Amino acid sequence: PCTSTTNMAQSTHKRKAANGHLGITEESRMLNSILIKMVSEIDTELRTGLRFVFTIEQPKSADVTEIPALKMLTEREDVYRAEFSMCWFGVPYQKHTYIWTNIKPLADALNQRRCSKDNPCAYFNRHEQVKGNSDECTPFPPQLCALIKDHVACHVSKRRFEPYCLPCA
């Protein structure tokens, strides 16, 4: 369902302000219901589960941050949105991507990996074009997976010996 938010798919899914950025297709509705459930669970865990960490990835598009469920996440002070380019992680295409997380060092590390003239990746000025079906761009590059894994492991290991208790009401 993530493809319902990509720039290439907007002529089909039509996530526009006029429909509250919810889109018009069954795929859009499916992603919306997944996001609503996921954000509800994340919100509950962030309020009650002190040892909870998460990441949500979505392709960057003009209006993806306006999808109501993702907008709710962005408005939280303990959630950080990172914007980065997949080409920084060893793939030849420049897929601009968002990740929402509650691990600030991860968001900071990802934000440093936006491909541009001032911050070029190894493929700068010779990125491969993705036309039509974007399925080949869907898998996370191993370097990105390793970065996320390292930050999650570091974050949870620092908290391993903290006493676990719920916040006072």
Please annotate each region the language model reported.
Residues P1-A169:
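Conserved active-site and SAM-binding loop architecture
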